[in-house]
Regions:
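Extracellular ligand-binding/catalytic regions of CAZymes and related secreted enzymes
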Residues: 20, 77-148
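Stable alpha-helical elements in mature extracytoplasmic
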Residues: 10, 14, 39, 43, ...
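Short alpha-beta junction capping motif
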Residues: 1-8, 102, 108
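Catalytic beta-strand/loop cores that center a nucleophilic Ser/Cys/Thr
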Residues: 20-101
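Short catalytic/ligand-binding loop motif for oxyanion handling, primarily in non-cytosolic enzymes
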Residues: 5-13, 114-117
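Extended active-site neighborhood of metal-dependent phosphoesterases/phosphodiesterases
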Residues: 8-26
Length: 148
């Protein structure tokens, strides 16, 4: 959740397992358009195709769509240019899920403050990510390419 990409920086395998690393939050807390790329996934099926959300948006590095299924992404094209912002080929993943060996891994950049955690949609998303990680629900994590 949120700050997990900042943990265990001296342990490369942790970053590999998680699927990415923290690389700044150039806009700090801002309202952004979020694209739901996985309306069929248990943790994101309750979100509309595109919705606005306010949070501190973490930028990732060492992330590859070849290894993870992006569930939610920020539409960075709708934001003003910002120093330090460098989406990966225009892509700004926020929530993803993947397999790591026989384990299920999910990450979300959402959840900076209590207001976000008090949001019922975010609570449902995290509950469903946990249930999926435990194998209690099924969800396709086949990687998909970035589509603008």
């Amino acid at each position: 959740a949120h700050t997990a990409t900042t943990a265990f920086l001296a342990w490369p395998e942790f970053g590999e397992m998680l699927g990415g690393r923290y690389d700044n939050h150039p806009w700090n807390t801002v309202e952004v358009p979020i694209v739901n790329e996985a309306p069929d996934f248990p943790a994101t099926k309750h979100f509309p195709a595109v919705f606005n959300f306010t949070d501190e948006m973490y930028q990732s590095k060492d992330f590859s769509r070849a290894n993870s299924r992006v569930l939610l992404r920020m539409d960075a094209s709708k934001l003003p240019p910002k120093e330090g912002a460098h989406p990966i080929d225009g892509d700004f993943p926020l929530v993803w899920a993947k397999m790591y060996g026989k384990g299920r891994v999910a990450y979300s950049a959402l959840g900076h403050d209590a207001k976000v955690w008090d949001n019922p949609d975010i609570q449902k998303m995290y509950l469903e990510l946990i249930r999926w990680s435990l194998g209690q629900t099924e969800g396709d994590v086949t990687p998909r390419p970035f589509r603008k």
